[in-house]
Amino acid sequence: MSGGGGSQSSLRRYLGAIKDTTTVSLAKVNSDYKELDIAIVKATNHVERPSKERYIRAIFMAISATRPRADVAYCIHALARRLSRTHNWAVALKTLIVIHRALREVDQTFHEEVINYSRSRSHMLNMSHFKDDSGPNAWAYSAWVRFYALFLEERLECFRVLKYDVEVDPPRTKDLDTPDLLEQLPALQELLFRVLDCQPEGAAVQNHIIQLALSMVISESTKIYQALTDGIDNLVDKFFDMQRNDAVKALDMYRRAVKQAGRLSEFFEVCKSVNVGRGERFIKIEQPPTSFLQAMEEYVKEAPLAAGVKKEQVVEKLTAPKEILAIEYEIPPKVVEEKPASPEPVKAEAEKPVEKQPDLLSMDDPAPMVSELEEKNALALAIVPVSVEQPHSTTDFTNGNSTGWELALVTAPSSNEGAAADSKLAGGLDKLTLDSLYEDAIRVSQQQNRSYNPWEQNPVHNGHMMHQPFYASNGVAAPQPFQMANQNHQTFGYQHQNAGMMMGPVQQPYQQQQQNMNNPFGNPFVSNGNPQQPQGYNPYPRYM
């Protein structure tokens, strides 16, 4: 079995040497960066021994700040490609060592280039799936390689948060304020956790390449711990002035620092036992006092009350009266504040009358003859009030021999005669004057409709809606005084009507409509019986 295992390991070494030689030959023929590619291949070959220093220096020269950024980007890409394609623990570990040394020894521009490369593409240091199953020892080596890659990845993240390298620059956590402490201390504690994960176990303890990488991790762990110690001391000094949320975060950091201090002491003891980091100066780890931890926990429990007391004190300071010099100011008397009266309602401003546009054609002006006629009609319709109202007599008209209500009104004795005499038209108008008024009204209305607006067409009226001036309602009986007053003129109306039918021509329907439309007292919705029947001129159509 042992002979078979030795032959397999020899075969793997032989195949690894062939791969390295082939890669170097291809780089000499096809690569634009021949020297850089050859240095990368020889610095990360399959030989299970530390790399030669001259090849590592050649790589550092290619990624220095004086070189073009294209050369730096190509070198990072070549290292990432070499790391992602290999399944050999020696090649992977040597590549990680080159990157680690470059982070420590090259300027900070290399940090920025690696971070930008990891953002633009997949994380070049992500080796969570790396595994070398060539043998039992290779399994142990592969596990340590994965932890080492996590440490380097966290180192870049810590550099991004702190904006400086802990290994190269002195720690700055001693003078930070509370917000910066709460941001930077978690990054340092996470980096210290990755350091503690690099503790070797099993076969990895005796491997020379792993011991070389572990020595660099130990040297950085002391710097990380010093930065954390300064930050924790600064945090404790500001703890009792923090708000509750910040105090809870600070208490969690302090608890984490206590645990990390114990684990870091064990880590240093293991490294000393295997003679790793003999040239390094191990620092003494001091445990934070547990009594102080209890005081911090009690403060966090009472933090809301303390915050309230402080808030009241701040309010009292803000509301305290300010001192005023008597020379410059005089103390005004106390004035009782009166409630302001309710505002008076705002009066709405009257809108300005809109000026009408002048009627140049005088289409809206009423005719002068029409206005004069209206005045005469108003005078004619004025009713003289009766001073003494006589009682009406109730006479039984059913006992008479008359057959019509008109005859009964004439023959029956009534006390309304006096009232009819008193209810004459004002001004002493007689029948002829009243007839002339009717004729003038008809003539003026005809002239107005024909000549007042020459652009307006004559409307066509319905024959069933004809009416005359002073035409009473067709469905309601006239008042009794008007009936008695006009009974004497009944005979004259009949005679005038018969004469018109015998002598005059048939009146035109339109003229009859014009006459009937001039009566504002007529009912326009009552039919006129037989509108098509020709009629003569009748100034008293109501008494037909």
From Swiss-Prot:
Q: Name one GO biological process term.
A: clathrin coat assembly
Q: Name one GO cellular component term.
A: clathrin-coated pit
Q: Where is the composition biased (Basic and acidic residues)?
A: 338-358
Q: Which residues carry this modification: Phosphoserine?
A: S342
Q: Which UniProt keywords apply?
A: Coated pit, Cytoplasmic vesicle, Endocytosis, Golgi apparatus, Membrane, Phosphoprotein
List, alphabetically, the Pfam families matched. ANTH (PF07651)
- In this chain, the stretch annotated as Disordered covers 338-361
What this protein is called in its record is Putative clathrin assembly protein At5g35200
Q: Which organism is it from?
A: Arabidopsis thaliana
Lineage, opening ranks: Eukaryota, Viridiplantae, Streptophyta, Embryophyta, Tracheophyta
